[in-house]
């Protein structure tokens, strides 16, 4: 039975199966497609073929939404239209969306000393014996921040990790069901795996059947403010520069790219692997990092002319990097 209700449901189901087979269907995809489905059913209940009017009315920016929100809301429908065009199932044209406001944020460039001081501070958090919340904080901070640093995971992905998705035998984390992002797998470094195993054993003594890997004293997952606040407090205790927990993800990408500059490599293969491991929907999103690595374009030109032109074109920033 179809989950869609409009007369376009057969086409939507067809599109959904295609995206699932391509590993490009997430929970957020479901919500966005259902929104367009309801739009079609409410305003065009008798239409069993896609029309320009149906699409244009959906793409119109709403008074209550930002330009970026409008672009995100319409992105999947754009892909749906392109999918139908390629199969000659529609003549509808993808409407031009409002230009996205570019993010001018420059991630913090961590120094070795800053990171060393930060992780040392994490390892030496003190707690009172009768304060379970402080004890859990002292156990969690060294592990979750090292996890972000060593894997490039999004902060929301780390906070949303369920125990069932963390394979501590093989050292593989499954990122599934995270709103708006592709499902993917992350392989842990041996040292990170050992930390995760030790942490899990300690947490099992407190909450034997917990659902989430990282939980508070109430046995519920931490919220984003807990991660943000604790990173800031610990960071500010040993460093004077400004940085955020999400900068650890940026650092992961940039460090990988910098390491490649001293190797013989195929840029396309490397960036494809990095893109997949970071859960980017498209390679275009991974290319963002090339714009913030100093002098990378000249290094690339010297090492590989073949893929230089592929990297250099303007980056499509439809996918959020945050």
Task: Identify the function of each model-found stretch.
Residues 1-322:
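Conserved catalytic core of the tyrosine transesterase superfamily
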